[in-house]
Amino acid sequence: MIVGKVNMRYVAFVAVVAAVGGFLFGYDTAVISGTIDTVAGQFSLDALQKGWYVGCALVGSIFGVSVAGVLGDSIGRKRSMILSAVLFTVSAFGCAVSATFAELVAYRIVGGVGIGIVSVISPLYISEMSVPKHRGRLVSLYQLAITVGFLGAYMANYALLQFEHTALLSGSSFVVKVFGSESWRGMLGLETLPAVVFLLIIFFIPESPRWLMLKRREDEAMAVVGRIYENRTDVETELSGIRASVGAEKRTEWRELSQKSVRKMVVVGVAIAILGQFMGVNAVLSYGPSIFSDSGLSSGDSLFYQVLVGSVNMLTTILALLIIDKVGRKKLVYYGVGGMIVSLLLIAAYFACGQTLGISPVALLTVFLAYIFCCAISICVVVWVLLSEMYPTKVRGLAMSIAGLSLWVGTYLIGQLTPWMLSTLAPAGTFLLFAVMCVPYILIVWRLVPETKGLSLEEIEKITK
């Protein structure tokens, strides 16, 4: 039991630094939406090439998340984040200067690898550096940073497009191309700035004490824990817990995964990662403009709706960050997913008969925003917290990679299937299916996921055995 003071300024600092990786994740994922048409026009892309441009980063992400656990457990959490920052920097700058479509795709894939690595390592690192009382909100900083990255990308796209339309620049210089005639270069290249900042500030944070203990570097681990806890007794208590967790019989990670209790939690993690993608949130974020158009909102500004959705997403994530350690992970899922089901049923009903009944499309937009609110306050935040908490230290990196890979596979599948579902099942059937997929998610969390609020990682490891 920790009884003394905690240096929360220091803990918050290292958490914010790691969360910058989430900002890059969000920006890199969302910025593509503002560049599709201009890139397709400049390089004369056909439909297949256009789809490849949109999806190529996902290929890199799947590879990155596949190796992230091994990287994190072999070279450490800190150096893995440094690697991801380098990849983001190379990708952003390379995209800005690409002369051919092949070069552009190659650099997008490089950035995708960075996304995959950081999506596993950043929340894992924050979880291992946090204190039990505040771990939920600290890990939630990562999801908040993703939403800020989304919003930042939408706003950067809008600003550069407006700047391009003012036609203030003329000539053929590189600056003119980046911020004027070929503004997509500026949209993609702007990521270089936060990527370089991320790379530099990582050097001011320590390695995870749990990883250091795993590598038998106890003196270094003690120094890190000593900066978190001011009481010497608390330092010893924390180190004893970590030592007991990692000092048991040495096995390979894959052999450790064969244990029944560990295998069960890995399956649960995979299930909530995949199911979370089939509850519609990424379909709404990715295909929102076309869905809004089908609803009768085509006369409005699609970019405005995008920024509106991004704003609600970000502000709700801030609320979730403030309450997750008070309300608990499972209650947020119950309330949030319950609200998602209601919202999805209302959306399906609108597409089935709302237009016939003369219901205003603004009502649909309101329900969409309510749906985003329910997602952001529950599954979008809770999934990263749970995945960073629910595995033993010795397999945490590998297990998070498996769950993260499942999440990215789910993202890929929903991205590919959504257009087909919208055309085959119609919007009404598609959103009804999303509502149905919420049911097994909430049942899995209810029956198989323990409440981890206020528990140390070592205490969580005990109750999941």
Regions found by a protein language model. Give the residues of each.
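Alpha-helical transmembrane bundle of multi-pass membrane proteins
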Residues: M1-E220, V224-G226, V246-K465
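Short, well-structured alpha-helical segments
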Residues: R232-A244
